[in-house]
């Protein structure tokens, strides 16, 4: 016995506590203070421990995990006033073995199974397997199997310990409730984990959708930037683009509804703007698309013609006036200078009368500079015709019928006969516009109230003498003459100013 064991025994004596292991003492009974310390092995109160010898020859004690008697009074650590500490120790037990014996007091107490219960374990596992409970999920059964395998090698010959262990075995005639509850809790935890995973996946899906939307928007913005760099025409404002994709899909009839009611300046400026914008648009359109667009424009119906009827009529009027003045100055001035003419209400007759007046009043100026005189007369007649035409647009429809019977055919020359034919064509211009036919559009015939009154006076003067008719004619020519601010009254000064 070493000093460590002596120290422990002395402390146990002072404290009156027994700290020996249960493998050396099975049960204790009150012992009176007598001279004996150790009773014989044949006594009823104690059962000696069983030892087995290993292959190395060292002695190992087989420890029992549970007491044979389940009574609080027989507990070895319970202090009793009349109890005496009894320690049975084998002389061959080493110090580390004694330390392990003392540490075994804090180990958990597990109830072992009997050999009879071991025979019923396969049936229990089969019944548990039928309910879908694996044996690995139960810690109680695994610990029981481990202890049972260790107890098979032990030599328990005491009938008292066997009876006590049979009484404390777990009933195996049914399913273990604790195992069912444990499996139920496990399944609930698994369901909660699955639900949490589903929620996490949903959140991740929403986050990915937001990222996808943001990246798609960024891609669209990059495409717009690249298109602006490649095509400078896209940088122009939207109001300057005529052939936008949305505008191309609109039918031509709906586009021309409001265009027909627009004012004259907007109608005149619209073709210029559209031509300018179409050149910008053609930069980003292939030649095939341009050809197809031209074919569609050529094959459009009469609604397109009615759209441009009024601007074309105005252009036609200016063209006829300019053409007439050019022809008159180049070819007809010399041939018609000496022929008497009758004043008519058309712009061409006004130009003729003014030209004849200039020829009669200033022959010296025209002989000195014939080219300058012809140009001045042309400009003068053109300005007079435009002024008379703008003032007589509203009275056009009321005075067209009276114009045809205004003059006598006796005083008409060949040139006047041709002008009468052109006037008859212009009279039917309203019907040509309604039918959509532009072939009959000709120079418009303008007429004012003063002209109408003077024409009536001229028709009445045809029956008078030639001198009286000449005087009326001269007064008409002077009335149709365009006067400027600060201009003298005499005709000679006006002719000199124009020349």
Swiss-Prot record:
Pfam families: TDA11 (PF17084). It is found in: Cytoplasm. GO terms for cellular component: cytoplasm. The modification Phosphoserine is found at residues 244, 286. Residues 290-301, 403-421 have a biased composition (Basic and acidic residues). Residues 470-479 have a biased composition (Basic residues). The modification Phosphothreonine is found at residue 236. This is Topoisomerase I damage affected protein 11. The gene is TDA11.
